[in-house]
Amino acid sequence: MGVLSDVADFGKDVIDDRDKWADRFKKVGHFIERNAKGDRLERVAKFGRALGDFSGKFTDFFESNLGKRMVKAARSPILAAGQHVITGMKLTTGVGDPENGRRFGEGADHMSAAGRTLDSAYPTSDWDSAASDAYLSQNNGQVTRAEALVHADQVVAAVLSREAEQIATTREVLDSEADWLGDMSLVTMATGLIPYVGRAAQTAAEIAMVTKAVGASTDQFMMMRDKADENAAEVRDAIGKYEAVAGDADDTTADDTAGDAPESEPTAAEDSSETSKEDGQSRHENPVAAPSGGGGGATSGGGGGAPSSASSAGPAGTPQVPSPPGFGAANTPTDAQPGAAAASDAAGMLGSVMGAMLGPLGGIVGGVVQAAGQALQAATQAGAQAAQLAGQAAAAPDVDRADTDEDTDKDPDAEGDKDSDKRDGEGKEDGTAPRDRESTDAMGADDDDRNAHPQAGSGTDSAGEDDKKPAMTLPPDLQAASALDTGAGSAPVHVGADFEHSQLRTVAAATLDHGIPGSAAARGA
């Protein structure tokens, strides 16, 4: 901050707080006057009285026209607005000391020391083997990665240090422009005291000053923004180097892990081959009978089972030959090769998986076929039953009329016995619904009064309801058969039934409704 700016700020504070300052002057003068007693302190007492009088004159000055102009001149909203804009630009540069990259520089130094240690750790000529070659390769990779990290740390440290200097320079420029506006406030305030034209001249001068200061601050601010973008691009490049080093380390670790696996496989194969050779020699010296189909390593018949364990009859360590799916154990012992055993295991696993996948599918297809067959059988039975009922309904009217004519001339009881025997024989030959006729005859046999008067009970059924109404027990599958009959009216039909559970032979008559086959009303014969 400049000296003129400090003076201007102090003067503005005094003008704004003029009443408080006048009161302070008055209190200080009265204090000095009260305590300055005696001839030697007379001058001090006079100074106190003068200071008290000045407080009154100070207040009177600001109440005058000149004092009011000074108050108005001190209150410059134009300069205050310019300083506020510059302060906002300065806040974008942060608060406090910027990061100078010192810690990244220290990290680069430590990594350089680690790189020097790795550089001195190369194998010497005394160590020459496959292990030394592997160690040399790994050490080279570590040294390369350390150098890359050192370079990245140095780049970041340099960028942060340069940006810290740029931020400091920008802050200085912005502060200088704000201070310049504060210094010019004394000039503009004096210009505003000029009568008539002072206020207009002050306003024009302040606008020009703010334009100049804010313009210079804006140029510096935009320059700082461009430099910050460049610095950010360099930092992003350094981040890419860090990520490349990390990815290289991961790839190296993965390669080492993958490279260790093949080395163990030849060892296992060699052990297996040696064991096979020893077992072969022992079998040539001491032959052992091959296990039969019941005690050997048989596989399951499903096509996917793995071979079972070796038979207890053979010697320990004797390899068993896996038998084909669905067959027993091998009949002759054969040396099992590692490749054949692996292929057999793979085939067994594949068969198990395929069996597990296709098993549910076969069950579903079988269920669908079974359901289709049941549906076809039910449809065939329903069609045959409907055709049979339709034929009975069509032949019923003629038989009923003939029986009615004969009943008028002959004795009802005698003719009823004959008709009963006749119908009984027809019912057995045709094989049509014996249970329905037994229920109808049972209802006719229970009512003795209607048996004595057959014509009187022809209009009602066993429940006492009108036989012209459809029966409540009509099966749904007779609706199609009922549509074939177009006749109207009711005709009596003599139906004979032989009760299988008793020696009683009862003749009963039934009235069939032509419109709805199966609807019957029983009456006595």
From Swiss-Prot:
This is ESX-1 secretion-associated protein EspE. Pfam families: EspA_EspE. Keywords: Cytoplasm. One of its GO terms (cellular component) is cytoplasm. Residues 244-341, 375-494 are annotated as: Disordered. It comes from Mycolicibacterium smegmatis (strain ATCC 700084 / mc(2)155). Its main location: cytoplasm. Residues 248-258 have a biased composition (Acidic residues). Residues 307-319, 332-341, 375-397 have a biased composition (Low complexity). It comes from the Bacteria. Residues 274-286, 411-440 have a biased composition (Basic and acidic residues). It is found in: Cytoplasm. Residues 292-306 have a biased composition (Gly residues).
